[in-house]
Amino acid sequence: MPARQSPASRRWRMLQTLAVTTVLAGLLSACGVHPRPYTLASPEQKSEFPEIQWCGTLRLPGKWLDDTPVGGLSDIGWDQDESLLYAVSDRGWLHRLRLAFRHGELVGAKALNTYTLRDETDVSLRGALSDAEGLQLLRANNDRRGDSRLVISFEQQPRVEHFLPSGLAVSEPFTPMGARGAAPNNGMEALTLHPQYGMLAGLEATPEGMSEGMTRIFSLDDKHEWSYPLASDTGSSLTAMEMLPDGDMLMLERAFSPPFPLVISLRRAHLGEPGTQAEVRTLARLSSGDGWSLDNFEGLTHLEGNRFLMISDDNFSSFQTTLLSCFAVIEPEAFTAESAPE
């Protein structure tokens, strides 16, 4: 028969158990608010698209350490001068993150500040006014700190505004002519700064008056327009675009139309003369039907050189995740040189 424990001994064991339980709960809770590594696909699957080289993916938590909700992230922008990543949500939140890389791989992300987007009178944007979808940074790579500006496009009430890094609007909102004919919730998702044509925007889906499967890219000064052929996957839509180092554009498309698989397409587009159709070539077609573990990728930003980040919008759904993924676009000639026999 086992020896009977004294009341003092039982109390001590109970305290030990409670302490261990508390520590474990704290560790589990901490894991739930820190980004974790995530695997999009096997090395064999990734190797099927040699023009895309992956450099790390993180699964972001549903909230930061201070309980600020993380979700609905629709676009991101990299500030090279400040080494900061900005992320906007379709509920009017602006997050600022510090990223960590190890040997070129994305391994961490730490939240620094979160602000609400606010109008020129410092009143927070709410409801349909807060539906931020596109983000592009200005003066973020000029070797001067403290002068960055954020250009943000909104969808439900279509317009473009300029903001300070604190989320305060510093310009009157305006709606460019190129946004005409866009259906509700299919507006200006994509923004980029073109070296020749200035700030460009792209509509998510086919606007009224254009052929099915085509959408519009246009300059915000209303001077230039191009037609853009969407990928052939059912429901494919343009969600983001960024400049490539050689002057072409990197396009991010998402096709989500159940019962078809979720498909994320990374494409290269070349703009010819205004008024013409963009020349487009698919670099990678990532499909959940082929074993890729994807989510609703719709945000994109240029890091430096040929490296980019893309982010997914979890729609604040418990069935989805917010993924932040790093990749490089390998130039065809570079790939040919690397794969040539010795």
Stretches with model-predicted labels:
Residues 17-27:
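Bacterial N-terminal signal peptides
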